[in-house]
Amino acid sequence: MAIPITVLDCDLLLYGRGHRTLDRFKLDDVTDEYLMSMYGFPRQFIYYLVELLGASLSRPTQRSRAISPETQILAALGFYTSGSFQTRMGDAIGISQASMSRCVANVTEALVERASQFIHFPADEASVQALKDEFYGLAGIPGVIGVVDCMHVAIKAPNAEDLSYVNRKGLHSLNCLMVCDIRGALMTVETSWPGSLQDCVVLQQSSLSSQFEAGMHKESWLLGDSSFFLRTWLMTPLHIPETPAEYRYNMAHSATHSVIEKTFRTLCSRFRCLDGSKGALQYSPEKSSHIILACCVLHNISLEHGMDVWSSPVTGPVEQPPEEEYEHMESLDLEADRIRQELMLTHFS
């Protein structure tokens, strides 16, 4: 069971009742446009988060000097969507940057605790078949239940000796493995992998790979790009297509794989703390991975609430940490080769 967390208003403790306190900020006192511009989400969505997370962010008995769950959530949303602890953000809700930092930490942990509630593969056969039908309707590849890829998020250097987080571009990052459906909803998110690991290694060592290898998603497969090895459950593009069927397969694969590329762009445009435009995440790898996961939870909740996340406006340049450059991964799995050949002959000849 989650342990309730209370954040004290340090500004009130320092300055007393004469200082602007959190009780004076009310959602009903500001416009919808203000909430969207400052915190990136509409009023009803914020109210839902207060209901969802309130018990984890406050004690059972109210204390006048505790920062309310509502204000903690606004502070966290402000950081996630802007990427910085701006003075104006804290001033808007009446707290210091130090208090904002504690609010972000608490809201992040509350969201991470609920990750499995919002990020998962469908459990029933009807939903799985609906996934396959949707992907088939997109580009004609049957049996697909998700698209997989990795996204790097820049973090500060943990320490001078630890090179495991240094990627091929010489930047410190986390390599985050994700799977999404055709709407961009995330079904798997693993955010703690060091940036030095190649995508294929991350997938090989992931719980996602263990699930498919154990046969948990029978008669289904994922689509991944050429940074991954071909598997019986993971279809990749051909390195050098030669026949018309192979060209058509690669084109269909590219069209389908673009769903997760679009999802990554959406995550980074909505949650600017991930895109590097305000610098790397200034936290330990563990805390950074939790922030990334919290943003992914919010992304999925947005979709559940009918928000059109793909049309969200980009307020500035989206600067993803440089992507890794990989050579094409040749298949070592003869059965996977056979399945892909049969797929091309049956559906793309």
Swiss-Prot record:
Residues 148-300 form the DDE Tnp4 domain. Pfam families: DDE_Tnp_4 (PF13359). Its main location: nucleus. It comes from the Eukaryota. It is found in: Nucleus; Cytoplasm. Its EC number is 3.1.-.-. The lineage of its organism: Eukaryota, Metazoa, Chordata, Craniata, Vertebrata. This is Putative nuclease HARBI1. A divalent metal cation binds at D149, D199, D225, E261. Interacts with NAIF1. It comes from Bos taurus (Bovine). It is an enzyme of class 3 (hydrolase). Belongs to the HARBI1 family. Keywords: Cytoplasm, Hydrolase, Metal-binding, Nuclease, Nucleus. Transposase-derived protein that may have nuclease activity (Potential). Does not have transposase activity. Its cofactor is a divalent metal cation. One of its GO terms (molecular function) is metal ion binding. InterPro entries: HARBI1-like, HARBI1_animal, HARBI1_dom. Detected in brain. One of its GO terms (cellular component) is nucleus.
